[in-house]
């Protein structure tokens, strides 16, 4: 319901602003003829050139570009190296084992503390 009313409102607003919702008759001459906008002449210079913002082109340093492209290729090859992938896997595995062991130690300490509290209460 809400979507339908929103769509009707948008369509009505569009037709209202454009003024072309419905033509009066087939022979109506009330329409506007196609032509250039009066402000379109503002964008053309006296020399018939368009007035666009000019940007100075920097001189390209091809040697630096070449070094960058080889650097990217070198990085891509490093990422595809299976030896480094295996090393990374084992390093991450060691970190995971360390975190798991720390969690187990904390759980054991909590269990020990609960037993001590239970013994002291009885």
Swiss-Prot record:
Identify the main location: secreted
Signal listed as a keyword = yes
One Gene Ontology term from the biological process aspect of the record: symbiont-mediated perturbation of host transcription
Source superkingdom: Eukaryota
Summarize the impact of residue 98 to A: Impairs host nuclear localization
Membrane-spanning ranges: none
Gene Ontology cellular component? extracellular region; host cell nucleus
Tell me yes or no: is Transferase among this UniProt entry's keywords. no
Assembly, per entry: Interacts with host acetyl transferase TAP1.
- Region entry Nuclear localization signal (NLS), spans: 87-98
Provide the effect of residue 87 to A: Impairs host nuclear localization
Null-mutant phenotype, please? Answer: Leads to smaller lesions on soybean seedlings.
What this protein is reported to do is described as:
Effector that suppresses plant defense responses during the early stages of pathogen infection. Suppresses cell death induced by effectors and PAMPs in plant hosts. Interacts with host acetyltransferase TAP1 and causes TAP1 relocation into the nucleus where it acetylates histones H2A and H3 during early infection, thereby promoting susceptibility of host plant to P.sojae.
Species source reads: Phytophthora sojae (strain P6497)
**What's the family?**
Belongs to the RxLR effector family.
Entry protein name: RxLR effector protein Avh52
């Amino acid at each position: 319901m809400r979507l339908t009313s929103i769509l009707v409102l948008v369509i009505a607003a569009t037709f209202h602003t454009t003024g072309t919702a419905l033509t009066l008759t087939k022979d109506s001459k009330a329409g506007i003829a196609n032509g250039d906008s009066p402000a379109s002449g503002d964008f053309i210079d006296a020399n018939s050139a368009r007035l666009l913002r000019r940007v100075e082109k920097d001189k390209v340093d091809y040697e630096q570009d070449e070094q960058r492209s080889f650097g990217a290729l070198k990085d891509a090859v490093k990422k595809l190296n299976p030896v480094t992938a295996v090393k990374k896997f084992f390093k991450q595995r060691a970190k995971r084992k360390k975190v798991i062991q720390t969690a187990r130690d904390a759980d054991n300490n909590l269990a020990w503390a609960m037993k001590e509290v239970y013994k002291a209460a009885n």
